Amino acid sequence: MRTRWCVLVVLMLAGSMMLVSCGQEEQGRQQGRGGDTGAVKPDIRGSIENAVAFLRAAQHKDGGWGARGSGVGITGLVIEALAGIPEDIRKKNADLIEKGVKYILANRRKDGSIVNEDGMVANYRTSIATRALIAIDREKYKDTIDAAVKYTKGIQGTDPNDKAKFGSMGYGSDKTKGDIINTAEALEMLEKAGVSKDDDVWKRAMVFLSRTHNSDEDAEAGVKTANDGGAIYRSVRDVEGASKAGTIKLPDGTEVPRSYGGATYALLKSLLFAGMKKDHPRVQAAYKWICDHYTVKEHPELGQQGLYYFYFTMVRTLELWGDPTIKQGAAVHNWAEQLAAQIISLQKKDGSWTNPKDKWWESDPALVSAYCIFSLNSCQRMLEK
């Protein structure tokens, strides 16, 4: 009799364990893509402290950061991220910020750009470095910021007959081609620098942005799009690399560039910076795509490629939008809580992050850690709303 009771108890306990396990799995699924679950709040502060400790150890003697040596772009991203950490942590690490700012200032050029000696990706580096200076002390670095604004406005495509470049900025100083990512980074810098919405730079940008939008309403005569509200990388659709996510086939067999996460978030953010209202059909179309494709597990349509830059763009866009939740069908996501938990779960023991799927330099721990600190700062602000 005693033996039968023991067996029964064991079976009952096993059944309970299975029920708990299934409940935990369901909760995990809901937290990744569904509504709030009452899970423990992510320890954002602790994660940031560990990440800052890593960056202290990783800073080069010249004040810069980067796995391949100091770089203006990576250093700018680190400084911009550190500018937003909790004030007490920031004060304890003021020396890191001071050294980083000195490194940025040491790389100013006469044309207003801020770039390493190799002169590569001048627009991208200038946009990032200038935003870092704005975040630290706008008035103190006003002359440098003003010079960078003039430089950036000067490299925007201004020939209306050049559909590949008009209204956009690319990686470098040339005016041969532009893309949604570099244009968005530059426009964000111009917005933070206070460039008037009446400036022609925004009007030209709107033309470029409309050409990257997968919307038949925005498309020029004879141009077919995926018409899903998302965005692509370039404004000219019949070239290789028009979308980082490749192409899709329309019902009539026509291949068109596929929308993907980073481009669509960049589009929405840029439309808002350029002055377009939230209730505008173009803005609503982009936001609907974002809601429909919401996830914190991957970069929509690109999997793990560029995952951390996607997070970096995601938080800037959604914080600008201002809603702490996203609706996806019947599910309601607390995106800041879910994203913070996901980022923290990926942090390494030394406080850093890297992406095993090395694309766009995401094997560099200083770069990716800057993305993550910035993203966690944004999540924290939204959770405090």
Regions found by a protein language model. Give the residues of each.
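An alpha-helical repeat/solenoid feature that recognizes helix-turn-helix modules
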Residues: 27-50, 64-96, 110-150, 155-207, ...
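Bacterial N-terminal signal peptides that target proteins for export
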Residues: 1-9
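C-terminal motif of bacterial Sec signal peptides marking the signal peptidase cleavage site
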Residues: 19-21
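Extracellular, repeat-based ectodomains that mediate carbohydrate processing or recognition
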Residues: 37, 54-57
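Active-site-surrounding "flap" and adjacent substrate/cofactor-binding loops of secreted or lumenal enzymes
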Residues: 101-107
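Gram-negative bacterial Sec-dependent N-terminal signal peptides
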Residues: 10-17
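Short polar catalytic/cofactor-binding loops
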Residues: 58-62
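Bacterial signal peptide processing site
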Residues: 23-25
